[in-house]
């Protein structure tokens, strides 16, 4: 643990705040972390309060049960991270599928973020993230949408929200395409506490933009022949679009992919 702590401090000094880079403290999850490692992760968050912290929470029932065996003193999975000082507005918890009401309240009260990883959750059969319930509850959760680098099947946010739509539909709800595109732009920026820099086209924001082509493939072009509203075009991009629909990318106003 001490070596990991020292190495992390060195990486923070080297990279955090360099240009647009942000360092995230990343304990893999409670199962693979010793109490000493989690304690030192919490210490880093206290020493560097502007850092993000990302880890894994309540993905499947077997994982939850095993975690409780390893930390029998805890009320629940979330209580472990709370005990070590790893909750807060900069804390991002992947999955969060099987949260109890108490856990959801704790995450909400602390401002922590539940990260929706639909391609991973469907691929692994982990369960269905209750997006609308988490947003509508008396103590709503902050939510991000992500690919999950480990279990996800695609890095595209279009594909991510297409699978997210299916997860929500399996629970008898729908996700409006405007809500989908809000989630992967300003919604995710807010989840990262970076809405002052990214996520909008407001004056003063970094000019990070993606130009999408709703006629990128023959199937999309055919479907566009009957599209008459922006919501339909966005839904088409979400359900049929992928990396082929990306025409141009601008990072801080500079073209990353030639037009």
Question: Each predicted region: which residue ranges?
Answer:
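Metal-coordinating catalytic core of metallo-dependent amide/deamination hydrolases
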Residues: 1-94
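Conserved, mostly hydrophobic/aromatic
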Residues: 25, 41, 56, 81, ...
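Active-site-proximal loop/turn and secondary-structure-junction residues that shape catalytic pockets
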Residues: 29-31, 57-63, 97-99, 118-122, ...
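Structural detector of well-ordered beta-strand residues that form the stable sheet scaffold
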Residues: 53-54, 92-94, 115, 144-146, ...
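A general structural motif
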Residues: 70-75, 94-100, 122-127, 150-154
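His/Asp/Glu-enriched, well-ordered alpha-helical/loop segment
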Residues: 83-90, 131-222
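A conserved active-site cap/scaffold subdomain adjacent to cofactor or substrate pockets
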Residues: 99-133, 138-141, 146-147
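C-terminal cap of metal-dependent C-N hydrolases
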Residues: 206-259
């Amino acid at each position: 643990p001490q070596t990991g702590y020292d190495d992390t401090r060195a990486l923070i000094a080297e990279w955090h705040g360099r240009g647009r880079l942000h360092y995230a403290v990343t304990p893999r999850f409670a199962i693979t972390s010793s109490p000493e490692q989690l304690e030192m992760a919490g210490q880093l968050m206290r020493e560097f309060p502007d850092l993000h912290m990302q880890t894994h929470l309540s993905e499947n029932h077997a994982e939850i049960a095993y975690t409780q065996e390893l930390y029998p003193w805890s009320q629940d999975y979330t209580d472990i991270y709370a005990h070590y000082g790893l909750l807060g507005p900069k804390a991002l918890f992947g999955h969060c599928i099987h949260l109890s009401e108490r856990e959801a309240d704790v995450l909400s009260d602390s401002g922590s973020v539940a990260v929706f990883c639909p391609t991973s959750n469907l691929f692994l059969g982990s369960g269905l993230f209750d997006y609308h319930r988490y947003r509508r509850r008396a103590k709503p959760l902050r939510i991000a949408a992500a690919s999950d680098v480990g279990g996800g099947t695609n890095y595209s946010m279009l594909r991510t929200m297409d699978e997210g739509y299916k997860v929500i539909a399996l629970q008898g709800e729908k996700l409006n395409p405007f809500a989908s595109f809000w989630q992967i732009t300003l919604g995710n920026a807010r989840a990262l506490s970076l809405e002052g820099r990214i996520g909008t086209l407001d004056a003063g924001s970094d000019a990070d933009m993606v130009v999408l082509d709703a006629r990128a493939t023959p199937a999309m072009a055919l479907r566009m022949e009957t599209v008459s509203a922006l919501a339909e075009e966005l839904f088409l991009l979400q359900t049929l679009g992928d990396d082929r629909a990306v025409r141009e990318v601008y990072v801080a106003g500079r073209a990353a992919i030639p037009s």
